[in-house]
């Protein structure tokens, strides 16, 4: 484990947090409750210690998150005493929106993308921190640290600004905003090593244990509640699995694993040859799926 490398990444991220807090009028941090959000929260607390985090955390709740994620979210808000905003798209809730009834693409657009834009508009945020990393996915590989969004929250890769060294351009007109990615230069392995080094709390779903899963289209989907339909030709099996990425439970694939400690997870990361986002069903909706979602306002 290269401590100098991790400390350099930490210092860069803390600098970005402080820059945004000083430069923008009304920032917010998107809190998805996953491992990257856990690191973001830890870095934000470090950046402004011994004071409190000077901006709220926003969780866009799709109504289909893992139960353990919601319990963990609420416990973290209680333990660390940060301001937590939770937003659900009311139109989506009224429609009974869900991945089984409306499909993954429509569900994600309504409950995540539209829900996020509603929340950003409601509170008038001009900057929003997110945990995206350039190593995750090809459209994120070309993302800036300061990602400019127009008045409709849309991302245009051709209109992004040059970033020289650690100089960031945060100028926005009324209605425009910046999405900020302090973890841009981190890798998945960096995240796990930092979590281990700093003893950062994470959702237990990242650790392997016996869980009820159904194999569907080659993906292991955990049966998290009774809303999940089980086909006549499907069988719920108890398997030792964990998650590399977390989202809506019907759209998140588990991986078979026995790694139930952080050193074991790090060892898996050193050997794996697949992207963590292979477990995200929404990334496979169509070619260039993530880039299209970002252009529509997705994070």
Swiss-Prot record:
Coiled coil: none annotated. The keyword DNA damage does not apply. CDD domains: Sulfate_adenylyltransferase_2. Keywords: ATP-binding, Nucleotide-binding, Nucleotidyltransferase, Transferase. It catalyses: sulfate + ATP + H(+) = adenosine 5'-phosphosulfate + diphosphate. The keyword Transferase applies. Its EC number is 2.7.7.4. GO terms for molecular function: ATP binding; sulfate adenylyltransferase (ATP) activity. Pfam families: PAPS_reduct (PF01507). GO terms for biological process: hydrogen sulfide biosynthetic process; sulfate assimilation. It comes from the Bacteria. Pathway: Sulfur metabolism; hydrogen sulfide biosynthesis; sulfite from sulfate: step 1/3. With CysN forms the ATP sulfurylase (ATPS) that catalyzes the adenylation of sulfate producing adenosine 5'-phosphosulfate (APS) and diphosphate, the first enzymatic step in sulfur assimilation pathway. APS synthesis involves the formation of a high-energy phosphoric-sulfuric acid anhydride bond driven by GTP hydrolysis by CysN coupled to ATP hydrolysis by CysD. Heterodimer composed of CysD, the smaller subunit, and CysN. Belongs to the PAPS reductase family. CysD subfamily. This is Sulfate adenylyltransferase subunit 2. The lineage of its organism: Bacteria, Pseudomonadati, Pseudomonadota, Gammaproteobacteria, Alteromonadales.
